[in-house]
Amino acid sequence: MSAVEVGGAWTERPSILAAPALEASAEKRSLLILKWFLLSLKRQFYIGGGEALKKPLNPFLGELFIADYTDGDATAHLVTEQVSHHPPITAAYMWDEAHGIHGSGYFRVEMVFNSGFGSGAASGLGIDLRQYGHALIHIDRFDEDYLIPAAQARVKGFLSGQLYPELIGTSHIVSSSGFISEIQFSPPAKSGGWLKWPRFGGGKDQRNLFKAVLYRRDDPKRTPLYVIAGQWSGAFTITHCESGRVIETVELSAGTPAVPAETLPVEEMDPLETRRAWKPVIEAIRKGDMADTSRQKARLEDAQREKRTVEERTGAKWEPLFFQKLEGKYELFERLGSATSWPLEQELTDGVWVVDEQKVQKMKRSFRPDSILVE
């Protein structure tokens, strides 16, 4: 699948996404947002939902993914768009109008070879997947915002021939109600100050470990209110610190199943929608025909180059359909990001990308009748 579908990680568990909007306690809402974030990670980094690492297709400029996700009493909607090709930036917007929760974000992924020397958290030969960007979630009922990180990852397993992603470093989620979640990925080389890393299932596979703590922003001691620890790709526990009780054990494969994306039939999609645009390529990949895969990819890429050539010749300026660059100060990011000295890094993402909600709500196919795409 194309990288524009990775945004489905946010919405494939609609009831988990909606849960914070139903919770009266600001502290517990922050915990539920943290839980939602952790549950989204496997889909983001194990592309296709399997246990092996797969590289997604590189989106073309203007590529779209539009889908709904429903489980129980919750329905989440998702629109993602490739808003830049150089550098490659994917923007996403999700919403659940019934529960009054919505969010948008933009991300750039850069692959960098790393020898693994000189960093305890990133030890071992691998490729760094450096992510730039962030997301913001808003809960209408409480007029509350959450700043969501882009986790950093490494591709490991080159020596064994079994590649897998390993998240590294420390990430934060910051809420406007005064709580911070701090997430440390992978056992640090010297785990001073950390509790013993848990082992789930009795097996030897201890990849994808993490530990997260939730504390108050105004607490200089950062006293943990909750600790979540385990495997972000498997199972983890949530512990209430004051009582010492494990209040929940979360298992991705059992207790919190993801639901598939609901989309139009491929033949009814706009030519810019990813599953229609890439259909010949996907079919060739499934047949194992690498020669035809290369031919089909070349056809699509050549069509895109022709479109860019026409725009350059006519002086036409390409603009995204549903997102735009922010003009002026980014006050919400500055207010939340200052809690952890969070850098914006807008020079690495060709600016700050925000959704135009009115355009999303008024969307109507066909989106760009003059688009040059192969069928």
Task: Locate each region found by the language model.
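Extended acidic, Ser/Thr- and Pro-enriched interaction/regulatory segments
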Residues: 1-22, 27-375
